[in-house]
Amino acid sequence: MICHNQQSSQRPTIKTCPGETNCYKKRWRDHRGTIIERGCGCPSVKKGVGIYCCKTDKCNR
């Protein structure tokens, strides 16, 4: 699996994730504004955090 791997303030990067079958994109708000995080897997999240999980390469753009 190949996923986008970054946080809002970072430049976009790509990561190869051996053994993973999902990529994710999390989104939440705090005092800095809307924060977006991308990576490998499909983690559980706290209440108030939106998550999108997908199963194809680079699908979490």
From Swiss-Prot:
Expressed by the venom gland. GO terms for molecular function: acetylcholine receptor inhibitor activity; ion channel regulator activity; toxin activity. Signal peptide: none annotated. Keywords: Acetylcholine receptor inhibiting toxin, Disulfide bond, Ion channel impairing toxin, Neurotoxin, Postsynaptic neurotoxin, Secreted, Toxin. It is found in: Secreted. InterPro entries: Snake_3FTx (IPR003571), Snake_toxin-like_sf (IPR045860), Snake_toxin_con_site (IPR018354), Toxin_cobra-type (IPR054131). GO terms for cellular component: extracellular region. Disulfide bonds join 3-23, 17-40, 42-53, 54-59. Binds to muscle nicotinic acetylcholine receptor (nAChR) and inhibit acetylcholine from binding to the receptor, thereby impairing neuromuscular transmission. Belongs to the three-finger toxin family. Short-chain subfamily. Type I alpha-neurotoxin sub-subfamily. This is Short neurotoxin 2.
